[in-house]
Amino acid sequence: MIKFLSALILLLVTTAAQAERIRDLTSVQGVRQNSLIGYGLVVGLDGTGDQTTQTPFTTQTLNNMLSQLGITVPTGTNMQLKNVAAVMVTASLPPFGRQGQTIDVVVSSMGNAKSLRGGTLLMTPLKGVDSQVYALAQGNILVGGAGASAGGSSVQVNQLNGGRITNGAVIERELPSQFGVGNTLNLQLNDEDFSMAQQIADTINRVRGYGSATALDARAIQVRVPSGNSSQVRFLADIQNMQVNVTPQDAKVVINSRTGSVVMNREVTLDSCAVAQGNLSVTVNRQANVSQPDTPFGGGQTVVTPQTQIDLRQSGGSLQSVRSSASLNNVVRALNALGATPIDLMSILQSMQSAGCLRAKLEII
């Protein structure tokens, strides 16, 4: 019986403390991506490009490109083009990116083009914040949306004014790296946590020797490494595969006010409370009343007068009891029992936190 209880306690402890690799919890300070941006032209559109009379920068860009290719456009020429669009091109330069390596680019219309489907991005230099060209982008655009229009009716699925080119840019310039310089580097936690930072430092010290790692704060752990690139690569490879017991994270509820989505982690709990939620609906009806003269040849005029009716209804919500819930499943059941919409649920969660019934951090994005 004692052995059974000991095994059960050990099982519960190992289940509560989940082991994770250090590489999944941290990143190396200084090893990061860098944003690139460029301005270019997309050609080959099927009549869905910019209306050049309303987007003069498209025509100006096209004239500059043609002049660089040795083609002179007569002054005052009004080019009515529908298969060209001005776009912004963005990409991320990966850490340790080498010359000749390809990266993905995102192409977004900046004019009034209807769609970029079927278009080809012409050679576009991508620059960093230092105005240096780090990559050149060119290729056929893949647009995930779809749309059609006929007879004054149209239908559209997803976004047509943006697309992606897989491996659409070639790196032409490398960023200087400080990796391998010095005898220390910092590991940055993905989420600030004092206990996790100390656990990682203790784990490294147990394997590599005391003094190998020091927790600087809730985000950074300083690690002593051997000098030289190859030695540091091997050292980091060993450290990143070490296992650390992950402590329960902070209870948090994230609300997206634009989409109405609500996401919560498993640490969220509720205390007993009572909730009443009323719904307010506004209905606007507008009709056109036509008044015509009684005599057809009396010289009167037909008059159209709009008539608008506004109906305001508010349904009173009954007071409902929400029981104390200690697990995520019980929290979900308790909130679903209220029968509230996602928009109402956001207000309810905010009120619960103000009343001290929601045991979690509330974050609105």
From Swiss-Prot:
UniProt-annotated location(s): Periplasm; Bacterial flagellum basal body
GO cellular component entries: bacterial-type flagellum basal body, distal rod, P ring; outer membrane-bounded periplasmic space
Alphabetical UniProt keywords: Bacterial flagellum, Periplasm, Signal
UniProt KW Signal keyword: yes
Location, primary (coarse class): periplasm
Parts of the chain that traverse the membrane: none
Molecular-function GO terms, alphabetical: structural molecule activity
Record's signal peptide: 1-19
The keyword Signal is assigned to this record: yes
Gene Ontology BP annotations: bacterial-type flagellum-dependent cell motility
Function in brief: Assembles around the rod to form the L-ring and probably protects the motor/basal body from shearing forces during rotation.
PANTHER family (UniProt xref): FLAGELLAR P-RING PERIPLASMIC PROTEIN FLGI, FLAGELLAR P-RING PROTEIN
NCBIfam families assigned to the protein according to its UniProt record, in alphabetical order: PRK05303.1 (NF003676)
Similarity section: Belongs to the FlgI family.
Assembly information from the UniProt record: The basal body constitutes a major portion of the flagellar organelle and consists of four rings (L,P,S, and M) mounted on a central rod.
This protein's name: Flagellar P-ring protein
Lineage: Bacteria, Pseudomonadati, Pseudomonadota, Gammaproteobacteria, Enterobacterales
